[in-house]
Amino acid sequence: MKNLNNIKNILFDCDGVLYEDLDAVFGQVSKKMTQYISNKLNVNLKKAKELQTSYFHKYNTSLNGLMIHHKVDPKDFLKFVHDIDLSCLNKNDILRNELINLNLKKYVFTNGSREHAENIIRQLGIEDLFDDIFDIVDAKYFPKPDPNNYDLMLKKFQIDPKETLYIEDIAKNLSIAKKLGTTTVWLINEEQWGKKDSDKEFIDYKIKNVSLFLKEIRLLKSA
């Protein structure tokens, strides 16, 4: 691992990064999205799922496509799809300890809502360890990897991208960050949409476990 002494800030994507069981949580969100689309557009669940998937791949979030093509109220959408059961998530003491011992500014950087991110980190028992959250509303609904999203995030957090490390499970979302000088970290996964572009040079590190990686950073910076 290269020298990371210049790193002062760390960005965490939320879903799929702060917890491992993506299906248990985001699987619920996905089903709620399908139901929302079916209800709003008066289509069957199969057609709704097709639109959801198509918009996600074309516009980086299903919400973005729904706003463009169907003038969906984003706040109504976010409130509905994030009303889920998080009892499947347990407190993560290992992650908590590593976050506590890592002397860096810590931020959540998500394409979801602030409320959803707050619910996740509260369920994990790490809600008091983050300096701030940047969500899709802060991004004016420009989803990652839209350059506007990154510009707005940097302005809100008032951080230097060259002093920042960013952990993400969707590889393509790291591309713009790398151009800005951010140290990029891809959390390895087998989701097709997650690993697309994972072979590109804009990824500095590929990791299998967030807590272990944070421990490595801590040990490196204290050496």
Tell where the protein language model's regions lie, with residue ranges.
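Conserved phosphate-coupling serine/threonine residues in phosphotransfer and NTP-handling enzymes
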Residues: 110-112
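N-terminal helical cap/lid subdomain that shapes the substrate entry/recognition surface
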Residues: 3-94, 115
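Catalytic-core regions built around general acid/base machinery
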Residues: 94-103
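Secondary-structure boundary/capping signal
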Residues: 44-45, 74, 106, 128-130, ...
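Asp-based, Mg2+/Mn2+-dependent phosphohydrolase catalytic module
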Residues: 1-7, 100, 114, 118-223
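Generic anion/oxyanion-binding catalytic loop in active/binding sites
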Residues: 22, 37, 55, 106, ...
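Proline-centered loop/turn at the N-terminus of a beta-strand
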Residues: 105-107, 183
